[in-house]
Curated annotation (Swiss-Prot):
Residues where Omega-N-methylarginine is found: R444, R496, R518, R526, R536, R539
Organism (species): Mus musculus (Mouse)
GO MF, any single term: poly(A) binding
Coiled coil ranges: none
Keywords tagged on the record: Acetylation, Cytoplasm, Endoplasmic reticulum, Isopeptide bond, Methylation, Microsome, mRNA processing, mRNA splicing, Nucleus, Phosphoprotein, Repeat, Ribonucleoprotein, RNA-binding, Spliceosome, Ubl conjugation
Phosphotyrosine sites (modified residues): Y373
Stored Gene3D superfamilies: 3.30.70.330
Ranges where the record places region 3 X 4 AA repeats of Y-Y-G-Y: 460-488
Residues modified as N6-acetyllysine: K221, K363
Localization per record: Nucleus; Nucleus, Nucleoplasm; Microsome; Cytoplasm
Protein name in UniProt: Heterogeneous nuclear ribonucleoprotein Q
Amino acid sequence: MATEHVNGNGTEEPMDTTSAVIHSENFQTLLDAGLPQKVAEKLDEIYVAGLVAHSDLDERAIEALKEFNEDGALAVLQQFKDSDLSHVQNKSAFLCGVMKTYRQREKQGTKVADSSKGPDEAKIKALLERTGYTLDVTTGQRKYGGPPPDSVYSGQQPSVGTEIFVGKIPRDLFEDELVPLFEKAGPIWDLRLMMDPLTGLNRGYAFVTFCTKEAAQEAVKLYNNHEIRSGKHIGVCISVANNRLFVGSIPKSKTKEQILEEFSKVTEGLTDVILYHQPDDKKKNRGFCFLEYEDHKTAAQARRRLMSGKVKVWGNVGTVEWADPIEDPDPEVMAKVKVLFVRNLANTVTEEILEKSFSQFGKLERVKKLKDYAFIHFDERDGAVKAMEEMNGKDLEGENIEIVFAKPPDQKRKERKAQRQAAKNQMYDDYYYYGPPHMPPPTRGRGRGGRGGYGYPPDYYGYEDYYDYYGYDYHNYRGGYEDPYYGYEDFQVGARGRGGRGARGAAPSRGRGAAPPRGRAGYSQRGGPGSARGVRGARGGAQQQRGRGVRGARGGRGGNVGGKRKADGYNQPDTKRRQTNNQNWGSQPIAQQPLQGGDHSGNYGYKSENQEFYQDTFGQQWK
């Protein structure tokens, strides 16, 4: 029974039963940092509970907390306190992630409530005790392993080809179900489950890196379209981490060594520069290069830095984009290839010379030379093998040629290329652009009055697949690095532009026309006859049948030069770099692609430090 105190006046006063608040030694430090009294008390309460030490939170986290009003800060700290921090390595970054999630919910007008039910911690703990792996949790992902225990694997970090992408994962599924499944295929290096901070559930996809390529391939065979739960089938395919950047606007006089030195000054982790020279002048490059970095993380950081506009190389802010990653075809498929890719050909080399040089090793089906490279089709693989062994590195018309087996076509890549090309047509449909010095012959097209060529090398479409897919070993001259870049410098591509007015009554059919580049021999100079900037051809007259034409810059329109129009019924895709909607499951994804855009605000300085380094690049059907 509670006792009562009687004062000198004889009146009774209730006893103060509230216990004294215990503060940590860092409480005053929090007040001195500018936190409101109640916020400082709440954070200090977390300190006293032993969930977090003051040394675990850096200045950025405290400063970010000060930006909230008192109610918001208290709600954030309560959510932080209620979170399971047992597997969180960087608690300061985790707190910033909680703050970011809170703001996102506020913007969406949704109630800031507790996250949905997460993983069963008892099962997760049992898994970790059984395997000996570690688990690192951030607001954007859950990373299991990396590296694994020495008892499992003690070798070097796995190389390209050991990672798989797992899509269409049920949102409430976690490591306790994924790990036992995939470890049957082989030893796991790490498993990264992408998380949605707003819901506390996974995003529907994960990346699993195995210790060997064989294990990764086995996982694809075993679990692609595997029913992981009743009615729920996951999709699995080999994933390729991208560590290569495309950089344009490179001075043509620069060498590989100069480019490597210059970009190493402004970025870290640069390991190689892939540079190509002009076919007619080996002393000059083609105005672009590819930068290869140690891994995807360093490449992503370099890309953000180079795209910031603050970094200039040789006084220029260059064009920077992702290059397509290297993808290795199935060894079983490559073992059947009978086509050789020959590069570094001299200008004097003709198809007849190539046929004479290679026919001695076996019967040829076809020889096709395009620019400074060629494809040699053998009737039998043995002949191709002999030719590569004998001719690789040999001198042919003054140049040492390089030979590899051409990589087979990839249908999904072909479909993505078609989408990118159609998008490119729309992007430049109304854009005046003066053509580069070289102009390819007209290529067959479609559309009223004939469509001008896409600007590909002659007869390219017959070799589209091999040409595109081959280049990954030699870093590709164009195909694998996205068509929009083929408008650079010396590239043989027709400029996109409108032609001049056609004469009334005899004009080509409606559609933006093709015109010769200015200043070319045999064509009208700019300002000469028929060179006025044109618009649509006048109506009237007989419509021309479908024919050939080349896209040009400003110039005369008329005669038998075909018109150009937008692709019928084609809607502008999301981006020029990677269209992902309406793709089938079999598309090979790029793992670890950085979050889009250069705006990293609201992340409290943690975006570039291994936080949420991955995104879903695959559309809703993957989730």
